[in-house]
Every structure is written in C-alpha cells, then in structure tokens.
C-alpha cells in the first residue's frame, strides 16, 4: 500500500471537454482530483486533504482505480467506494447516484481511534473527515462563511453587533482552522492565531487567509493592540504551541474579546502538538509510540482548556469550535470542561432550524467568471437578503480561489432548489462555460449527529441519535443526487459523530432539473424535520410555512 508519493501532482481537468463518458461521472472525477490539487490539499503527496489525516482516497493504487472506474462508468452504473477504495460497480438507473461512498464507519463498540488506527495500518480503512473522502472540499473557503456567521453572531450577542476594536484568540491554521483569521477580519475583528507548523502559516499567508506573521508573542500582541486601537481589523499568525501560548497570554493578564480553538484536537495522535515537543519529535513518535503521543497531546489539551475556562469565568465569550477539545480535556480530568459551549448551540442553531446551512458550488470549467456570474444570479434571485449580498461582495473581494473556482453561501429550505435550477438553466443556455456541481459540508442542519458539536444540547435530549444522517443519506440517494456519502468521525473524531454528504451536477439537462428540484428541496428539509421533531418552535413554524408533511407534528 503506497500512500506517500510527493512526485504525484494532481490537478483536475478544466474546460468543456469530457475525459469520462458523461458530466455525471466527469464531475466526481474532477472533484476527486481537485481535492488533491497542491493549492487545495494540506498534504497532497500523502493523499491528505485536511483535518489531520482526512484523505481523498485510501492509497495511490485506489486513487488510480477510482479514476479509471469513473472514466469508464456508464450512465446506468453506480460505483461503490469503501473507505477510499473502489469495491464494486453495479447496474442501477440513470437517476441513481453515480457514486456511493462510505468512509470510516465502524460498529459502535469498536468505534475508537485505537481500533481505527489498527485497521488503517493494515490498509483496511481510511479517515474521510467530512469533505475530504466525499470529494467536495473547496479549500478553506468551505468553512469561511460558517465561521464568519459565528463571529458576527458572537459580536451581536456580546458586543452590540460591532466587533471593531475587538480581537479573537484562537489556534490552528489547517484546512478548517485556516478560515478563522479571514472570517474574523471580514466580521470586523482582529485575530491572533497560534499554529505549530510554519508550512501552514506560509500557506495561509500565500492564499490571503492571514495578513501577517509575528516574530514572537510580544510582536503579535503589539500588532493586535495597534489594530484594535485603530479599529482596523488585522489577522496575525504566530508560530508556537497552543497550550503554551494561551497560558502565557493569561499569565500576562492580557484579555482577548473572544476565545476559541480549531486545532485538530479531534485526533490526539496526528492533530495536536504536545507541549514542549518539537515537530520532528512529534512526527517520529507518532510512528513509534502513538499511544504515548496521544497521552501527551491530551495532557496539553487539558492545559489549554483550563486556560479557556479561566477566560470564560472572567466573562470572555469562549466557545469550542467543533474539534472536541473539551472532550479530550474531560478525559484528562478537567471536570468542568463543558462549562463553555460549543459554537452550534451558542450561535448557529437558529439557522439550522430553518434549514440554512453551507450551500456550495464549484465551476467545472475552471473559469472564475462562471462563479462571478452565479454570484450575480444569487443576488438576483434573493434581492432582499442584504446580509447575503454583503457576504458575496466580501467573498469576491477577499477570498482567493483554491483549485477549481468555487463559492460558499449559507442559504436554506426554499432557496437552495431555486438556485440550483437557475444554475442549471445558465449551463443550458451557454451562459456558463461548463457544468456546475452543488454540494455542502456534512456540517448541515439535517445531515449530522455529533453530540459535542452540531447536535450538542438538543432541546429534547436527542443529541446522540444518529438515525437522522442515515435518513438524510437514504433520501438524497432516492432523490437522485450525483454522489452520496456516509461517514463516521468527522470533525470530532472516532466514536463521536456520524454524518452524510451529497453532491449534485447541473449539466443543463431537463433530467437534471428534476433531480435538482428533488434533492435541493429534500436535503435541507431533513434539517427542518430533524429540528422540528426535537421541538424547536422556529423549525416547527418553518415546516408549516413550507408545507412539509411531518406526521408526528400532527
């Protein structure tokens, strides 16, 4: 099993010419390749897209077999992918998904990192994260708006809606955490982001997600102070260990205005540098002593969470940004680790109740103009959504495309299918140079069960009920999504989440119209259904307004 091959450079084809038999197979082929584009993936030579060890394919042989299968797949065939390996091609029908993916799923009793790593070493499994193994990662842009919405709501709740002159302390500049500095400045706040890898900081500087790197903590704090006094947002990256830097900031009596963290704490072996360790020592011992690495990392996480708790007790808005760091600290004896909330119950759940979540699309042409034309179409179809218009304007101005040009914007039930149909009409008319794919993060209102993140503190106590993402995947399959994925462990690690994804192609056909109308209505509707079933009044009202048939509501 060959995983590391830094000589392999993968980039998706561009333009209107097909390399597969149809756009319904060309699309997953290009998006798989795009996940491993050097401008997109964190460690493309190792097939790692983001999130610690979130991979696009199990190994390079599996990648090559998937590519070959997609190029030869007929319009009535479906490819099955098991944890990054193609395992079967079956006759289905043209409206069925062309690819069905299951990644990292384990029977609950065995759903631990230890058992996963054992299978991973044997070549029997891979970690798909959320959008890595489901082939719809679009770089850090994919989480920028969700992070922006979180920071805006944080400012609204705690600072009268104005983050000017405020600053956010955080850590982690990987594929997900790398969105934080840009999201902060877009929301009007400055940001100090601690990152242990120089390469990650360099990547965020190069792609415009962070403004400047400080030489040391003194300079970092001086830059933050200067920007706050001027009320001009600035993002500052600092190389260092999160536990050490957070503790030193607290020791100095410096008070941030908001505190969070987005290191890859969900994976204590591969995702978090233990305090006092060098990168070289960490990388070597991950192979020779993974249990020792995990133990040291969790001790350091506990130290960092204790500092976050101290800020929380001092009245600083402090939030877990979905990496399960509180759980790791709890397991290390920090009894009150969950005293500060996760970002979903604190700031995002009202959006989920209306089926609003991370709608994203990507231009298979490779031409940025196709994205700009779709941006304009979104504004035209949603003329009264000033907040969304402002987001789209900022995104065009501040977000650099990584790989195939793409866009993210949070829209909900009743709007997603309208946008999908409009994009398909633009492909049909030739206004767009090639088809568009529409997908989303697995972090959405109806597609995930994650008691320490998306479904934390549900109104009815149903945090751990994972029937909902399974139903979401089944419904998207029945509705005709182009590819559907069902994963375990994304975001928060083994044993803590199950989640589903879907992607659908706008190829300009009338058949695509029918599929788009079904999928892009049903997918967000499952989120409204899930939250209505849990008793949220906003979701119940939305379900009734939209005419959803939910028998248990009466």
From Swiss-Prot:
Belongs to the urocanase family. The keyword NAD applies. The active site is at 409. Binds 1 NAD(+) per subunit. It comes from Methylobacterium nodulans (strain LMG 21967 / CNCM I-2342 / ORS 2060). Its EC number is 4.2.1.49. Gene3D superfamilies: Urocanase like domains, Urocanase superfamily. NAD(+) binds at residues 51-52, 129, 175-177, 195, 241-242, 262-266, 272-273, 321, 491. NCBIfam families: hutU, PRK05414.1. Keywords: Cytoplasm, Histidine metabolism, Lyase, NAD. It catalyses: 4-imidazolone-5-propanoate = trans-urocanate + H2O. One of its GO terms (molecular function) is urocanate hydratase activity. Its main location: cytoplasm. One of its GO terms (cellular component) is cytoplasm. It comes from the Bacteria. Catalyzes the conversion of urocanate to 4-imidazolone-5-propionate. The keyword Transmembrane helix does not apply. The lineage of its organism: Bacteria, Pseudomonadati, Pseudomonadota, Alphaproteobacteria, Hyphomicrobiales. It is found in: Cytoplasm. This is Urocanate hydratase. GO terms for biological process: L-histidine catabolic process to glutamate and formamide; L-histidine catabolic process to glutamate and formate. Its cofactor is NAD(+). Transmembrane segments: none annotated. The gene is hutU.
